[in-house]
Amino acid sequence: MASGFPPQKQETQPGIQHVMEPTPEFSSSNYKPSNKLHGKVALVTGGDSGIGKAVCHCYALEGASVAFTYVKGREDKDAEETLRLLHEVKTREAKEPIMIATDLGFEENCKRVVEEVVNSFGRIDVLVNCAAEQHEVSIEDIDEARLERVFRTNIFSQFFLVKYALKHMKEGSSIINTTSVVAYAGNSSLLEYTATKGAIVSFTRGLALQLAPKGIRVNGVAPGPVWTPLIPASFSEEAIKQFGSETPMKRAAQPVEVAPSYVFLACNHCSSYYTGQILHPNGGLIVNA
């Protein structure tokens, strides 16, 4: 896989997948499912595209019944394509996948999402917090409204979803929060995003300690540069041409390369002794976290 991508720019967050060139890769013939999540119910936020879509796809292949959220309007086409895909690959025993349009930045919406999933599937075994937005901006240009918007999307939503999902999660359940390599390395232009991703690391660690007595594991994934709709919606065309080249592997990841980390953390047979931990699929960008 080469580093960098054709110049392109999207003007609105969180970006659209179906217009990207090349389209992010969410599946691979090299991935061999083995019923790791047979009988499980998974809720994935931001599952219409990017890492979230790849996670939904892997979970469905592994036997889970999958629900995902998306932002109504710009993401409709991506969400419908993901739902179609999940219908195609779901196992015989899994229930039909569902998609839920919502703005996760508000508590009442997070409560409604959990209620819809429980009404459809009866419970939640795996909660994946993947939805996010980011903006390139100088500290002088950050205003209160957008700062609140980014924090609501990226970290408030995780608090609210966990709050309402917990009563429907039993011992052996798993919560997986998406943070980022920028929480460890920093980023000079993504200040709001970086702050939220640092908060997610601390939230994950504290929540893991709080829920350990209940037998619910809480972990995180801190991806490096990954080719998702957030990228052309955040960076200049010139930056897109070089995206991923700063890693020792000299390229960005595709979502399908990151999704197996979420499978591992969701599967009790694989990660039963993991809690409060962060996995780092980052191409070697950080090696001492």
UniProtKB/Swiss-Prot annotation:
For the protein in the UniProt heading, the enzyme class is: oxidoreductase
Q: Where does substrate bind?
A: S180
Q: Which residues bind NAD(+) per the record?
A: 43-67
For this protein, the record's Gene3D superfamilies field holds: NAD(P)-binding Rossmann-like Domain
Q: Which GO terms describe its molecular function?
A: oxidoreductase activity, acting on CH-OH group of donors
EC assignment: the record states 1.1.1.-
SUPFAM superfamilies from the UniProt entry: NAD(P)-binding Rossmann-fold domains
CDD domains per record? SDR_c1
Quote the catalytic residue positions.
Y193 (proton acceptor)
Could you tell me which PROSITE patterns the record lists for this protein?
Answer: ADH_SHORT
The family database entries (InterPro entries) matched by this protein are listed as: NAD(P)-bd_dom_sf (IPR036291), Sc_DH/Rdtase_CS (IPR020904), SDR_fam (IPR002347)
Mind listing the UniProt keywords for this protein, alphabetically? Oxidoreductase
Instruction: State the residue spans of region: Disordered.
Output: 1-32
Please give the family membership noted in the entry.
Belongs to the short-chain dehydrogenases/reductases (SDR) family.
What is this protein's function per UniProt? Answer: May act as a short alcohol-polyol-sugar dehydrogenase possibly related to carbohydrate metabolism and the acquisition of desiccation tolerance. May also be involved in signal transduction.
Q: Which PANTHER family match?
A: GLUCOSE AND RIBITOL DEHYDROGENASE HOMOLOG 2 (PTHR48107:SF6), NADPH-DEPENDENT ALDEHYDE REDUCTASE-LIKE PROTEIN, CHLOROPLASTIC-RELATED (PTHR48107)
- Name the UniProt record assigns to this protein: Glucose and ribitol dehydrogenase homolog 2
Q: Which organism is it from?
A: Arabidopsis thaliana (Mouse-ear cress)
